[in-house]
Amino acid sequence: MNALRTVPVMLDIARRIEKLSPNAHLINFSNPSGIIAEALLNHTDVKVIGLCNCFINMHASIKENLGTADFDYEYVGLNHLSWITSVTVNGENILESLGKPVSMKNIPNLDYDDELLASVPAIPSPYLGYFYLKEAQLKKCLEAEKTRGEICVEIEESLLKQYEDPALEIKPKELMLRGGALYSTAAVSIADAIENDKNEYHVAGVKNNGSLPFMEDNDVIEAKCLVNNKGAFPVKLKNEINPYIKGLMQSVKAYERLTVKAAMTGSRADALAALMVHPLIGDFDKAKLVLDDMLKANAEYIHRGFNE
């Protein structure tokens, strides 16, 4: 539902950028970041780079583990559905020696079984817990006293109250609970690489453009990119991708494409199909129940076609 509300707004902003600043680069934080980038890169001429803080937190964890930033990596996925598939030091892949994946404060933490990690030999981003251990993750969410959304509302109300004080000079502790760690570092680093033509490597949301042969060229993926003053360009991977990763990416990408179409046209059929193809739902009765409730609750904020 976030996408159905946000895609039209971001498209409107993009149209203004096309008119007022056609050479600008738009670094997008708006969630759902991958779907927003999918919409803007395929339906506008704006130079969009999608951004998330998952990778930079994963990179920081590996750096802390190794005691050095002198390592290379391969990275594949979509926004909130991504993996580090190799970590090399002096040409040697040390992925298996790195231990358990990094966790994030805004996601219920579950301990991965060694056999699970061995079955898909890659470091999963924290959001993969929802796919790897769907029932256990759902159980944790249902047992929690409050939903993540309710917690975020409380955090933001507290932050906004503190920001009313012009004398505030310290970073509120609530910021560490919101789940946006290192976002500023990621954004400034990419902006710096573009503005100063640095030819640096960063992970970003961009069009596939042939970098992953199992995805469509126009699919927006999250990839290791070479970034310079012309934009961000995905780097082709050297290693073969696990079939599980390929299959999951393709099914979630189908969901993203259908969601963009639904958001732009107000098509209930496309919205329903999007939910049915998503691996976390995949059931007509569940999809219909959720969609009916959410379309009703958000009627004034979404495409009017949904209400016709």
Segments from the language model and where they lie:
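Intrinsic structural disorder
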Residues: E18, P32-I35, N53, A232-F233, ...
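Soluble or luminal CAZymes and related metallo-dependent hydrolases
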Residues: N2-V9, C54, L182, S251
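A non-catalytic, amphipathic alpha-helix used as a structural packing/dimerization or gating element
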Residues: D12, N57, Q250-A254
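Long, compositionally biased stretches enriched for glycine and/or charged residues
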Residues: K63-E308
